[in-house]
């Protein structure tokens, strides 16, 4: 005997039960009491996230899919950038943000082994780790107290002819002095990577223009780990307004593949078998050309649904 007339009816009933489950067993209906400890960070969700997760689970599309595509579109529109790409963690976002700047496609501006990157002396390891991993040299600048953000008066002293980039995080929702840092980067033609994992939604104003943190530099990164402002459980995002960096972000995220056509759509660009790549024979399938060392750092659609 069939329980439902069609799949849509089944999904609606299942999600209705999930909603009722949340309201009965998960919703916090108790008032805070005097002297109760309030967590500075924790997961925050309601029946909407649980229903979206249920929807993705019923799709059973286990890798990046429609929910990820929708999130990337909505997130980029909200934060105010042209391109945003989900990854499996904020640490992966930080890794990719640095990896793309080592690409030979960037010419003289690429970061090579031995080049220097100015960063903050007080921060999280994954802001620093990719610098060391790719053979560059971190140049540490101290923080100011009580802001615990980079002391911009010490930037000039940290600069040398080997400096290629500045990579720093906004601390606990408090933006660093973006105006001073950006002027410094513009003066010396340096890349600026904003680690925005702790500060999603913070705003900063320069000359009357107000923007979200993470959008003033060349690349911004966010983390969606449970203690952050928005959660997927695990997840992160890399975003930029630079079309070349956007292509490289996709390449490094998707195994180092040169082709950035939409996954699951055959010959989306219309030039899959028309190119000549290195020493490969002419007409070699572009979908299987790998121009960079990369990783599989995509997010699952179930995580994206929670976001």
Enumerate the predicted regions with their spans.
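Phosphate-binding glycine-rich loop
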Residues: 66-116, 129-134, 140
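N-terminal "arm"/small-domain region of PLP-dependent enzymes with the aminotransferase-like
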Residues: 1-62, 291
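Active-site phosphate-binding strand-loop segment of PLP-dependent enzymes
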Residues: 146-247
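Active-site region of PLP-dependent enzymes
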Residues: 198-206, 216-307
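Conserved coil-to-alpha-helix start sites within the AMP-binding
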Residues: 122-128
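Short beta-strand->loop structural element characteristic of the AMP-binding/adenylate-forming
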Residues: 137-147
């Amino acid at each position: 005997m069939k329980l439902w007339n069609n799949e849509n009816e089944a999904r609606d009933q299942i999600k209705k039960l999930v909603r009722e489950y949340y309201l009965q067993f998960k919703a916090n209906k108790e008032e805070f009491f005097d002297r109760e400890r309030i967590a500075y960070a924790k997961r925050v969700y309601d029946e909407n996230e649980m229903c979206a997760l249920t929807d993705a689970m019923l799709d059973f599309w286990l890798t990046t899919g429609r929910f990820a595509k929708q999130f990337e579109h909505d997130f980029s529109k909200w934060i105010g950038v042209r391109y945003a790409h989900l990854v499996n963690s904020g640490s992966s976002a930080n890794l990719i943000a640095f990896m793309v700047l080592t690409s030979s496609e960037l010419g003289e501006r690429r970061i090579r082994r031995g080049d220097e990157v100015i960063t903050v002396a007080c921060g999280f390891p994954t802001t620093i780790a990719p610098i060391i991993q790719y053979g560059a040299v971190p140049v540490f600048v101290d923080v100011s107290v009580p802001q615990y953000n980079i002391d911009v008066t010490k930037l000039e002293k940290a600069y040398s002819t080997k400096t290629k980039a500045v990579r720093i995080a906004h601390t606990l929702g408090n933006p660093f002095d973006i105006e001073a840092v950006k002027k410094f980067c513009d003066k010396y033609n340096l890349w600026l990577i904003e680690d925005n994992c702790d500060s999603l939604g913070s705003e900063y104003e320069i000359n009357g223009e107000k923007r979200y943190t993470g959008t003033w530099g060349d690349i911004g990164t966010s983390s969606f780990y449970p203690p952050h402002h928005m959660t997927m459980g695990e997840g992160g995002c890399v975003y930029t307004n630079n079309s070349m960096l956007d292509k490289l972000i996709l390449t490094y995220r998707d195994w180092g593949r040169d082709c950035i056509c939409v996954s699951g759509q055959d010959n989306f660009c219309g030039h899959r078998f028309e190119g000549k790549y290195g020493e490969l024979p002419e007409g070699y399938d572009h979908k299987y050309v790998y121009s960079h060392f990369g990783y599989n750092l995509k997010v699952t659609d179930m995580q994206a649904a929670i976001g």
